[in-house]
Amino acid sequence: MAKEEMLEFPGVVKELLPNATFRVELENGHEIIAHTAGKMRKNRIRVLAGDKVQVEMTPYDLTKGRINYRFK
């Protein structure tokens, strides 16, 4: 079975939550809970409130996501 295509959305980090999770507001106005991707953790890329990020989400659960890029 092939993997489902991930949905990618730009957003802004609104709040830092425990356990390396974040509340992210997407450009379309929705707020989701997102965690950092493994490569970002490995390379110690810091994400702070107010950062512009790219979030990928599965089409099955649109309330959770993964931050895979922090814009400069």
Swiss-Prot record:
Pfam families: eIF-1a. Keywords: Cytoplasm, Initiation factor, Protein biosynthesis, RNA-binding, rRNA-binding. Its main location: cytoplasm. It is found in: Cytoplasm. The keyword Cytoplasm applies. Component of the 30S ribosomal translation pre-initiation complex which assembles on the 30S ribosome in the order IF-2 and IF-3, IF-1 and N-formylmethionyl-tRNA(fMet); mRNA recruitment can occur at any time during PIC assembly. Belongs to the IF-1 family. This is Translation initiation factor IF-1. It comes from Jannaschia sp. (strain CCS1). The lineage of its organism: Bacteria, Pseudomonadati, Pseudomonadota, Alphaproteobacteria, Rhodobacterales.
